[in-house]
């Protein structure tokens, strides 16, 4: 509203992707399309307790050790080391920029956002009702996002799923050319009026389509 933009293609990664999904739920008439990238951490029911526990550990580390010390550990998580292996210089810049964030702001975000947000598995009704063209995008080594990505693909009638090979969580930084190409192709199809809704026949209780 402040920018006086009536409708837009909305692209978000990680927490931004979660916000993008909710934008589609709440303001579908304002979204030309949605790119929901790297979304799903802590979504699976069996992982929720551990995820909330780790959120508490992260917040405590931020407040007690400060942002620089935290960034030096967090950057080497299991879904971020892929970036270091591909582009050490880019990864070093990522880590430096991360260290400049506010420790208090980051801790509050962990506690009040990450720790309190609903599981994607509790939002299935909202997904099924949404018709905004949606691209679900994830890296194939962004382990916490793989099953939730399949969930969103299955439950959002207007969604497609793209998986970037040998990529972790920071897919827009790890392989910006591929990321931008996938997103650009998607937006181009939407703008051309060629983005389809899924044929209802594509979802069936049958595995082969040949029911006995």
Predicted regions and their residues:
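Conserved alpha/beta-hydrolase "acid-adjacent" motif
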Residues: 143-148
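Conserved alpha/beta-hydrolase catalytic His-Asp/Glu region
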Residues: 45-50, 63-126
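Catalytic active-site module of serine/aspartate enzymes centered on a nucleophile-bearing elbow/loop
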Residues: 159-212
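Flexible "cap/lid" loop of the alpha/beta hydrolase fold
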Residues: 21-26, 31-65, 69
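Short beta-strand/loop motif that positions the catalytic acidic residue
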Residues: 130, 136-138
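Gly/Ala-rich beta-loop-alpha elbow adjacent to hydrolase catalytic centers
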Residues: 12, 16, 20
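Conserved acidic catalytic loop of the alpha/beta-hydrolase fold
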Residues: 1-8
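Short beta-strand immediately N-terminal to the catalytic nucleophile in serine-hydrolase-like folds
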Residues: 10-12, 37
């Amino acid at each position: 509203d402040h920018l006086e933009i009536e409708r837009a293609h909305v692209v978000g990664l990680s927490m931004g992707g979660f916000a993008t999904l909710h934008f589609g739920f709440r303001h579908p008439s304002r979204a030309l399309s949605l790119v929901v990238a790297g979304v799903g951490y802590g979504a699976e029911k069996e992982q929720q307790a551990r995820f909330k526990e780790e959120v508490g550990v992260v917040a405590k580390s931020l407040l007690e050790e400060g942002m620089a010390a935290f960034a030096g550990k967090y950057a080497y998580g299991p879904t971020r080391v892929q970036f270091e292996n591909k582009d050490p210089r880019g990864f070093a810049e990522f880590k430096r920029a991360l260290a400049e964030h506010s420790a208090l702001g980051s801790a509050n975000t962990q506690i009040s956002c990450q720790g309190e947000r609903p599981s994607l598995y509790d939002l299935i009704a909202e997904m099924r009702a949404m018709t905004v063209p949606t691209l679900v995008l994830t890296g194939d080594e962004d382990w916490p996002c793989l099953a939730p990505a399949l969930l969103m693909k299955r439950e959002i009638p207007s969604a497609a799923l793209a998986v970037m090979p040998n990529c972790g969580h920071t897919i827009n930084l790890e392989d910006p050319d591929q990321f931008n190409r996938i997103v650009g192709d998607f937006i181009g199809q939407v703008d051309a009026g060629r983005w389809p809704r899924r044929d209802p026949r594509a979802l069936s209780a049958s595995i082969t389509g040949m029911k006995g």
